Amino acid sequence: NLTKEKNVIDKNIIDEKVSKSTTELPILTEEDEQTIEVQETEAEGFEEQGIIAYNGAEKTPNIQLGEYAGLTYYSQLDNRWRHKIYSSVGNTSQTIGTSGCGPASAAMIVSSIKGNITPDQMADLYTRYGYRSPNQGTYWSAFKWTADVFNIEYSECYRLDDAINKLKNNNYIIASCNQGLFTYGGHFIVLVGIEGNYIKIYDSYLYNGKYDVASRRGKAIVKGYTTYVSIQDFRQYANYRKFFCFKNNRTDTK
């Protein structure tokens, strides 16, 4: 019974004393979501291009982070950056709002472990160093590069059970998902914790009513900026492809 389980979550699980840089969720529709650029999740040539970008990119750019504020949520639809161009080919219709789940997810990870960096700053880095594909979102290799640049312990896995073990071991995880519970095309989401039988998710394309549509109803619980999905439903409906894991080794976690 989802209503009963929601009450359990409300009483026992949700305790979010976190600093969130995004302060309100946007009001969008299912139709709006269906018009965004599809983030590639599995094409072999796409992955090869990402590897080429990684092998050719500088790994030690001097980047100044802001103050560490603990677990941080960013919406790619935040008005401060949603209309900023995120394109490697000068396409002004490619913005952080339409195409920026990759840099938004990575910005959440780095801000939550090291210090503040915003989605538009991360998007500029990805474009500058070759991790923005022409028409298919962000290359997967951007995340390994991000871990290199910001000195974060990093690993990858494909099995959900392995990802859950990583979550239990103080990792934040970017999950690449194909068409399913979280997206109509392809999308990156951030797994920030595990509470009981629920995975805690930061979705940069979360909007009011996203999980009220027929195909998603009853499969997710939204509380504030966090989406809770049971492990069973994630396994069945997320259509996940790969997990990019970042270890939080801080001892002063907020």
How would you name each of these model-derived features?
Residues 1-131:
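Active-site-adjacent structural segments surrounding the nucleophilic cysteine of cysteine proteases
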Residues 153-206, 210:
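Active-site-adjacent substructure of cysteine-protease-like catalytic cores
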Residues 97, 102-106, 118, 122, ...:
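Stable alpha-helical elements in mature extracytoplasmic
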Residues 51-55, 63-64, 76, 140, ...:
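Solvent-exposed, well-ordered amphipathic alpha-helical segments
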Residues 194-254:
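Noncatalytic regulatory segments and standalone regulatory/sensor domains
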Residues 94, 103, 112-139, 153-156, ...:
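Cysteine-dependent hydrolase recognition
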